[in-house]
């Protein structure tokens, strides 16, 4: 498939507030091959996707002051990747449903041709895109209404700028949630739940500002820190008419 994306009004403005007539819309061609399947009497489900996207004149935001950005074209880029998902359902002791799962993505994104301000970034990895991401865990559900959800997330390192001179380290996060549902009246159901995010209290960046620039003799601020270990809980009530 093929497509295009035009610049926004903000991206077309120069630092002087004039329209940048040299800015071009980005165009792309996408190739994708996918597969889905159920196995072992529908207990095992799998997905696999391979894709390749070639983009010309990729639109990127370049920071020129503390709160001002301009749009530029980043030549040609390649976005290649693999995504897959596996989950399995089986009953344990006939009253407990166990569901292990795994989904992951491998990303191979790079500049195929990009020269900006006499700097050649051709062959560099695209900033802000991790090498890989992975989620896996076990979910439990009982006939009595008790449920337990576990999720372990792995995010690979990623470049912070076009030059690939700075990187954000990889990190792992563990999230847990438990709930209990029961009827308190015919048609009226109550759900109690509680959980913990970042159970291992990992220091990580929840969001990234690519190609950050330092101002006022300050270092560039690439990172916005993620929340430390935190807890939550609640009560939900539902009624079926």
What are the residue ranges of the model-derived segments?
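Surface-exposed extracellular loop regions of Gram-negative outer-membrane beta-barrel proteins
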Residues: 1-32, 43-46, 50-72, 112-115, ...
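Residue-level signature of outer-membrane beta-barrel architecture
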Residues: 2, 25, 37-39, 76, ...
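Outer-membrane beta-barrel proteins
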Residues: 19-25, 36, 70-74, 90, ...
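Residues that define the transmembrane beta-barrel architecture of outer-membrane proteins
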Residues: 27-31, 78-82, 128-134, 170-174, ...
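Residues on the lipid-exposed face of transmembrane beta-strands in outer-membrane beta-barrel proteins
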Residues: 33-37, 84-88, 102, 136-142, ...
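Repeated loop/turn-to-beta-strand initiation elements of outer-membrane beta-barrel proteins
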Residues: 41-46, 93-98, 144-148, 184-190, ...
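Gram-negative outer-membrane beta-barrel transporters
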Residues: 50-54, 72-160
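C-terminal beta-signal and adjacent terminal beta-strands/loops
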Residues: 98-99, 157-159, 180-241
């Amino acid at each position: 498939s093929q497509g295009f994306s035009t610049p926004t009004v903000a991206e077309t403005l120069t630092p002087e507030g004039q329209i940048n007539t040299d800015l071009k819309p980005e165009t792309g061609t996408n190739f994708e091959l996918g597969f889905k399947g159920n196995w072992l009497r529908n207990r095992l489900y799998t997905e696999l996707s391979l894709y390749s996207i070639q983009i010309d004149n990729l639109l990127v935001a370049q920071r020129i002051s503390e709160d001002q950005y301009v749009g530029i074209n980043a030549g040609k880029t390649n976005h290649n990747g693999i995504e897959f998902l596996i989950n399995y359902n089986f009953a344990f002791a006939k009253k407990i449903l166990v569901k292990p799962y795994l989904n992951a993505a491998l990303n191979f994104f790079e500049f195929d041709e990009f020269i900006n301000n006499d700097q050649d970034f051709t062959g560099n990895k695209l900033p802000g895109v991790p090498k890989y991401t992975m989620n896996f865990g076990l979910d439990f559900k009982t006939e009595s209404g008790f449920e337990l959800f576990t999720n372990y997330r792995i995010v690979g390192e990623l470049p912070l700028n076009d030059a690939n001179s700075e990187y954000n380290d990889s990190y792992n996060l563990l999230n847990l949630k438990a709930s209990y549902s029961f009827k308190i009246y015919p048609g009226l159901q109550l759900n109690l739940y509680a959980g913990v995010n970042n159970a291992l209290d990992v220091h990580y960046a929840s969001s990234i500002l690519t190609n950050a620039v330092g101002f006022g003799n300050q270092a560039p601020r690439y990172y916005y820190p993620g929340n430390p270990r935190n807890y939550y809980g609640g009560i939900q009530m539902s009624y079926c008419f």
